[in-house]
Amino acid sequence: MTKLPNKAKVVIIGGGIHGLSTAWKLSETYKNPGDIVVLEKKDTAAGASGIACGVIRNNYFQPAMRELMAHSVSVWESDPKAFKYNPVGYLQISPEVMHEDVASIYEQQKAIGYESVFIEGEKDCTNYMKGIFDDWQAQGITSVLHEKKGGYAFNKDSIKALESKSTSNGVQVMKGVKVTGFKKGSNSQAVTGVETDKGIIECEQV
């Protein structure tokens, strides 16, 4: 492993999708090599990011999440080859008990300009699904929300792509480094460094 640097402008803890996507975007502002350091106790994609299902969708009840996901889908679309992203869309196929909630999701998708189709009624839903899967047989379906964007990605490959994009911009990704605590200013609670099992790295932001 490369020796832990003594200091950095930004230290990011964790080499999953949150840590590496943050590093990648911050590297557009912090352009000097070594400005940003990512500390990962094992390997990139070793945690939840490496075992997630990989579905990319905008199917959430919270309005703020829908706007965030609409933005995130555009990031996946920016480099599908590198991210191993497959833009096949997303289907929510529901019984009557979910009709009202799914209709609400559709209306809010429409309000932010996120392309989707909402099919209502058992007969129309069956016909719509048979147009996609000619052997469709499910009964009791009264609504179908078809998001035309979204799809799925191979998550470990996606994380490695984020790592590559980050390091290409000068980010240092330090693996096998366990964070043990934080160094704080003498007269404040402001963090001035990150303590690890490999030493202390001074920083401006964590």
Q: How should each PLM-predicted stretch be described?
A:
Residues 27-49:
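Glycine-rich FAD pyrophosphate-binding loop
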Residues 145-205:
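Helical element adjacent to the flavin cofactor pocket in flavoenzyme catalytic cores
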Residues 20-24, 160:
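Short, hydrophobic alpha-helix immediately C-terminal to the catalytic nucleophile
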Residues 34-36, 116-117, 206:
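Hydrophobic anchor at the start of a short beta-strand
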Residues 53-132, 141:
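Dinucleotide-binding Rossmann-like beta1-alpha1 core, especially the glycine-rich loop
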